[in-house]
C-alpha cells in the first residue's frame, strides 16, 4: 500500500517512487550514532525509517533488535531488563530474547512454553566504521557498507569527526536542501564565509546545455548510485544580485575556493569536496526517523597521516570547524528545511512546486532515487 495518495502519485511525472518514500528507502545502510555514544552493556533506543529499535554493545560488538515484544507488542525499552549480557527480557511477561539472533530463548514466567525457540524478534545488521554506527535496515544479507557511503569516506587515511541531531522535517526536504545548487544564497551572511575567507557567489545561472549540469553515476565498482552537480563547472556564477538593473547584493570574493565537487548518493548522503576548507571534505547524511523528522548526521573528513595529525585535527574540529561550519554555516540549512515543511505536509507540494532551470540537479536526484533505490519503506514494514 502506498504511503502517499494514489491521486497525487499519478500526477508526479518521473519520480513517483521518490515521492512515495516518505519513510525512506529500505535495504540500505544508515548511520544512526557515533561509536563513542554507546557503551558496553548500555542499550540505546532509536527510531529508523519509522521502526523503533534497540542497540546494545556486547563484548565490543553491536547488535540491533526491533523494540517490540512479540507477545503483546509493548516496547522493551519502556523498562530495559537484561538479566544476562546476551539477552533482553520483556518487563511485562518476561519473554526473553537473544541479542545475537532475536530468538525467544526463555520465558521466565512459563519456562516450558511451546513458544520458546519457535518465535524470533526481528534483528538488523550493525557495522562500525570511521567512528560511526551504521544499521542495515533491510531484509536478507546486507551489501558491503561501501555501497551506501560516498567515495573517499572509507579511505584508510580519512579521519572522520562530526555531530548528529534531530531535525523536524522530512528527510527528502533535507536532501534537496543540501544538493540544491541555488540554495547557497541563504549562506551569504554565514560566519564561515567571512572568517574563513571563502569565495561564494549568490547563485549560478545555467550554461547553454542543461544536460551538462549533472552527471549520473549508476555503474560504480562497489554499486554506488549518485548524481554530481556540475553547474559550477558549466554554469555562470552570479556575484552581483540585481533588481531592475541595480546591484542590491554582492557575493563573497574570498581567496579560498571550496565546493568544486558536489554529489549526492543513495540512500541520501551528500559529499562536498573540498569543504569547509581546501584540505577537508564534508559528508552529511539525512537519515529518516519517520515521515516528519530526520537525523542530520554531519561529518567532516580530513586525510591524516599519523596520530599527531589526527590529534591536531580533533582539536581544530572542536575549536573551529564544528562551531563555524557544522553550526555557523549549516544551521542556515536547518531552518530552511523546516520552513518548507508546511508546503509539503499534505504531499501536494510535490505537484504544486514550480521548479526552475538550476533545479536540474534535484530532478536528476529524484529520478535516480526512484529508479535505483532498494525498496520503499512502508507502514507494513513498521508494524510487521
Curated annotation (Swiss-Prot):
Temperature-related behavior of activity: Optimum temperature is 30 degrees Celsius.
Top enzyme category: oxidoreductase
Keywords: 2Fe-2S, Dioxygenase, Iron, Iron-sulfur, Metal-binding, NAD, NADP, Oxidoreductase, Plasmid
One Pfam family of this chain: Aromatic_hydrox
Obligatory cofactor(s): [2Fe-2S] cluster
Domain named Rieske: residues: 29-135
GO MF entries: 2 iron, 2 sulfur cluster binding; carbazole 1,9a-dioxygenase [NAD(P)H] activity; metal ion binding
UniProt-listed SUPFAM superfamilies: Bet v1-like (SSF55961), ISP domain (SSF50022)
Cofactor comment text: Binds 1 [2Fe-2S] cluster per subunit.
Residues that hold [2Fe-2S] cluster according to the record: 69, 71, 90, 93
Substrates-to-products reaction catalysed: 9H-carbazole + NADH + O2 + H(+) = 2'-aminobiphenyl-2,3-diol + NAD(+); 9H-carbazole + NADPH + O2 + H(+) = 2'-aminobiphenyl-2,3-diol + NADP(+)
Enzyme nomenclature, EC number: 1.14.12.22
Description of pH dependence: Optimum pH is between 7 and 7.5.
Regions annotated as coiled coil: none
GO BP: carbazole catabolic process
Self-association state and partner proteins as the record states: Homotrimer. Carbazole 1,9a-dioxygenase complex consists of a terminal oxygenase component CarAa, a ferredoxin reductase component CarAd and a ferredoxin component CarAc.
Function in brief: Part of the multicomponent carbazole 1,9a-dioxygenase (CARDO), that converts carbazole (CAR) into 2-aminobiphenyl-2,3-diol. It is also able to attack the angular position adjacent of hetero atom of heterocyclic aromatic compounds such as polychlorinated dibenzo-p-dioxin (DD) and dibenzofuran (DBF).
Protein name as it appears in the record: Carbazole 1,9a-dioxygenase, terminal oxygenase component CarAa
Gene of this entry: carAa
Amino acid at each position: 500500500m502506498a504511503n502517499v495518495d494514489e491521486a497525487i502519485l499519478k500526477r508526479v511525472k518521473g519520480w513517483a517512487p521518490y515521492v512515495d518514500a516518505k519513510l525512506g528507502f529500505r535495504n540500505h545502510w544508515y548511520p544512526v550514532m557515533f561509536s563513542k555514544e554507546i557503551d558496553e552493556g548500555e542499550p540505546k533506543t532509536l527510531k529508523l525509517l519509522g521502526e523503533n529499535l534497540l542497540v546494545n554493545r556486547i563484548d565490543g560488538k553491536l547488535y540491533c533488535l526491533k523494540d517490540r515484544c512479540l507477545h503483546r507488542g509493548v516496547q522493551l525499552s519502556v523498562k530495559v531488563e537484561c538479566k544476562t549480557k546476551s539477552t533482553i527480557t520483556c518487563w511485562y511477561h518476561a519473554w526473553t530474547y537473544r541479542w545475537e539472533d532475536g530468538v525467544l530463548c526463555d520465558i521466565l514466567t512459563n519456562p516450558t512454553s511451546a513458544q520458546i525457540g519457535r518465535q524470533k524478534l526481528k534483528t538488523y545488521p550493525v557495522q562500525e566504521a570511521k567512528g560511526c554506527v551504521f544499521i542495515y535496515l533491510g531484509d536478507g544479507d546486507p551489501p558491503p557498507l561501501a555501497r551506501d557511503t560516498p567515495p573517499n569516506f572509507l579511505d584508510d587515511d580519512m579521519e572522520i569527526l562530526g555531530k548528529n541531531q534531530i531535525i523536524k522535517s522530512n528527510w527528502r526536504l533535507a536532501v534537496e536542501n543540501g544538493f540544491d545548487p541555488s540554495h547557497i544564497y541563504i549562506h551569504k551572511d554565514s560566519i564561515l564565509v567571512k572568517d574563513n575567507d571563502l569565495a561564494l557567489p549568490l547563485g549560478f545561472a545555467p550554461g547553454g546545455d542543461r544536460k551538462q549540469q549533472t552527471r549520473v553515476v549508476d555503474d560504480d565498482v562497489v554499486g554506488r548510485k549518485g548524481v554530481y552537480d556540475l553547474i559550477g563547472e558549466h554554469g555562470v556564477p552570479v556575484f552581483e544580485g540585481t533588481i531592475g538593473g541595480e546591484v542590491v547584493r554582492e557575493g563573497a570574493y574570498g581567496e579560498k575556493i571550496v565546493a568544486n565537487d558536489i554529489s549526492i548518493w543513495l540512500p541520501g548522503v551528500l559529499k562536498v569536496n573540498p569543504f569547509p576548507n581546501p584540505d577537508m571534505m564534508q559528508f552529511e547524511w539525512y537519515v529518516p526517523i519517520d515521515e516528519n523528522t530526520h537525523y542530520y548526521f554531519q561529518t567532516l573528513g580530513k586525510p591524516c597521516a599519523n596520530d599527531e595529525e589526527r590529534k591536531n585535527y580533533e582539536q581544530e574540529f572542536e575549536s573551529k570547524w564544528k562551531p563555524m561550519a557544522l553550526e555557523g554555516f549549516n544551521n542556515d540549512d536547518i531552518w530552511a528545511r523546516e520552513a518548507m515543511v508546511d508546503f509539503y505536509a499534505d504531499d501536494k507540494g510535490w505537484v504544486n512546486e514550480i521548479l526552475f532551470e538550476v533545479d536540474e540537479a534535484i530532478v536528476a536526484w529524484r529520478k535516480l532515487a526512484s529508479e535505483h533505490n532498494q525498496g520503499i519503506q512502508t507502514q507494513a514494514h513498521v508494524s510487521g
